[in-house]
Amino acid sequence: MAQLKVTLIHSAAHRLPKQRKIVEALGLKRVNSSVLQPDNEATRGALFQIAHLIKVEEVK
């Protein structure tokens, strides 16, 4: 299964509480921090809601 490399580009400060919780749940801490997440529907749904804050790359 493919993995997604998620990088936080913009700060989650001054965002809606739901968006801050999603950033925290994905394991992103600071700007420019990256995590690997599985490529599934649940992850893609979370990424869609904070798409304006992140950059996503597919990793094999």
From Swiss-Prot:
One of its GO terms (biological process) is translation. The keyword Phosphoprotein does not apply. Keywords: Ribonucleoprotein, Ribosomal protein. GO terms for cellular component: cytosolic large ribosomal subunit. CDD domains: Ribosomal_L30 (cd01658). The keyword Phosphoprotein does not apply. It comes from the Bacteria. GO terms for molecular function: structural constituent of ribosome. Signal peptide: none annotated. SUPFAM superfamilies: Ribosomal protein L30p/L7e. It holds the Pfam family Ribosomal_L30. Part of the 50S ribosomal subunit. Belongs to the universal ribosomal protein uL30 family. This is Large ribosomal subunit protein uL30. It comes from Levilactobacillus brevis (strain ATCC 367 / BCRC 12310 / CIP 105137 / JCM 1170 / LMG 11437 / NCIMB 947 / NCTC 947).
